[in-house]
């Protein structure tokens, strides 16, 4: 006798909710070169991406463009999950490609995994994409309690151990095609089994594939341990699991649908066309549909109101909002009501405070990298070996909280190789933490102003640092989606990576401009005295030319190896670095500025040209200062004739002479600002126009 076919109401309910609400947002590689719109690379990239869907479809779900030497070559890679139909694969590759181009404009390198049943990977770069184990980026996306299974502690423990055993089996089953799937029974769960697949990029070796999957197995402990449904991926591999079969990969292993809780053996049924359908099920399905629709409408209304309220706040404060990402890497946590707006508006990732606490060994003093007015910076390491720098806001500090919010809202959308990457943040009670990529060589001032370490900065390295900072500021001013003014450029806010390449850090004071906005005013003048231009100190007026002034001072410090504040009094007159260099120019002795640690083996014409550019940047009139795009051309094209600089701002006269600008300033309190991976011994000075 044929059994009545019953409907699992829980599965229907959660399927409707999930399919209506789960939307994945793209991610991009944090550091890459940038290209000009409609330029050679842009044209090649779009041509490559337009052909990628068909090539992936025609090559059994994986295709990598062959290497071609030469400039402006766009290399690409696409892969679809095993079991995806050819049409779904093609559509997925097309969708992800379009999303990446929209999300990462002018970015030469980007990568993203899609989500949903049609799981696929798209990656492109202006460099060779080789078959090495590339693990820089981690995705984790999952749906908690998709099937509404009750998780007691016993069940949760069983699920975790079963999941680990299943992943071990899957990894061991990986064959020459770099793919495997498996099923693991769950004795005490309504759904009885976990279904899982694992897959690697086909350009990996089998050994590297196994290593990549083993890392994912470990990653799961930090992001999604005990989660019933989800996927976790790195750049070269992914794992996916569910309590139901998916993609047609488990047809032979599918178990019977578990009985409905409403089926007690005596339910009323209606017979039609030879099929028995429970009357109670029909009523329940109708009720569930109404409830689901009501819930979704209420959620939509609530989200809409929250978004509008935040956008109003963002507009008033010069911030901007972006879409929320559901992907979460190591130790990240689901946003709660207190931080939901911050997470949704920044697109940044909220880390679990406990994960950061563990990574820094409970903020142990041996991991402390620096301390300032904002708080302390600690080195941390997650279980997978990823090193980070955690900036911890001092609990009683009122000064740091606005800067904290500003960095989360602003820096999360900035991606450039000469900017320090913000990985995420954590807010729990009074604890507020920013999590950055770890930069090993601390800040520029640790080398530049140290009598021993400064010898490591020869002229080619210093010139590379100047050029790298130029690229970073140019991105902020022109190439990012908004015009962003840093407002606190100085040696202690320039970090150096392992190859001594510069990365601009500390965006707590940064402001973004609206479209066509060229300048702004503020009643609260903040920054580091000596790097601030006269129009900002005196009138609170700032623009991109404010950063140009600070950059000019920084150029002169890099060449001279001396702080701007180290010039107190020369020959009876008050002085600073800018005044000192201007006098050297008038005396025809600019090379006297050069740091003796550089030695004699340097290009004198190149050094003089850089000093000249520095003086152009610190001119008193903002309109006379060159833009960062002009500065970049001056640095990289020696055929460009440099204009004659005008006298700089803050040109100090004899002590006996009055200084009109100084008389207009009312100095405020001075506090030290912290930054990623180093101690800033320069001070932040808050001054207000009198």
From Swiss-Prot:
Substrates-to-products reaction catalysed: L-seryl-[protein] + ATP = O-phospho-L-seryl-[protein] + ADP + H(+); L-threonyl-[protein] + ATP = O-phospho-L-threonyl-[protein] + ADP + H(+)
CDD domains: Gnk2-like (cd23509), STKc_IRAK (cd14066)
Signal peptide: 1-24
Subcellular location: Membrane
Modification Phosphoserine, positions: 492
Modified sites of kind Phosphotyrosine: 436, 536
Protein kinase domain residues: 363-640
SUPFAM superfamilies xrefs: Protein kinase-like (PK-like) (SSF56112)
Keyword Cell membrane on entry: no
UniProt-annotated binding residues for ATP: 369-377, 391
Any Pfam family hit: Pkinase
Cytoplasmic side, ranges: 303-690
Domain (Gnk2-homologous): residue spans on this chain: 25-129, 140-246
Xref: PANTHER family: CYSTEINE-RICH RECEPTOR-LIKE PROTEIN KINASE 21 (PTHR27002:SF742), RECEPTOR-LIKE SERINE/THREONINE-PROTEIN KINASE SD1-8 (PTHR27002)
Name of the molecule in the record: Cysteine-rich receptor-like protein kinase 21
